[in-house]
Amino acid sequence: LDTKLTIGDGGLFSQPFQNVANADLSNEYGSCESLRGVINTPLGLFFISQQQGKIFQYAGKGMDPISNNGMKWWFNKYLPSRFIKQFPSSENTQWTDNPVAGVGCQVMYDSVDDIVYFMKKDYQLKPDYIGQATFVDRPFKPVEIRGEARVPVSIDIGDPVYFDDCSWTVSYDPKSKAWISFHDWHPELALPSINHFFTTKTVTTTIPQCPPGYNFNST
C-alpha cells in the first residue's frame, strides 16, 4: 500500500542506519550464525562468526576481531564447523546450531572473574567412513552409514565409533585483551548465572580432551 509507519515519536527510527563495519554486504563481515554464540557483558558484546572463523567484541567503537590477538590462524582453521563441511545439507537444520543434540557454538561470561568463554561442540567423520555416510534430517539418528551391509546403519552425531571429537573451549580476558587458556570441558549447554555460570555434560571421561592441533603430554 506504499504506507510507512513510525513507532512512538519517531525520534529513534527516523535516523538513518549506520554500519558498524566498513565492508561490502557480500563479505558478510561480522555475521553471526549462532543463536547461543553471542553474549552481552559490561565489557561489551562478544559474538562468534563461525563461518568466517572469527570472534568479535563490540564495545561501541566498532567491531574488534579479538580472534586476531595471537590466534588468528588457529581460529580460521578450527572455528568453522567440520560437521557442516562434511555434510553441507545439514546446514540450517535442527542439528546444527544445536550443541545439545548436534553441533554448535556457545559463549558464556563469568561475572566474578570477568572472563569470557567460547565453546564449540563439533565432530568429524573418521577417515575410514568418509564417503560411506549421508545426512538425513529427521528427529533422531540423522546420520546413515552405508558399509558392506545392505541396510544402512543409523547413528547419532558424535558416535565415538564413527566420529572424532573436534570440540574445544577457550577463555579470553577482556581486561588484558589476551587469550588465557584452553579447557578440557566441552559442555552441551551453558547457562548464565549471577555468579559464574552453569554447564551440562551427559558423558564424562578421564581421557584428556585436547583442542584440535594439540596433543596431551603426561610429562
Where are the model-predicted features located?
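Beta-sheet-dominated scaffold domains
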Residues: 1-218
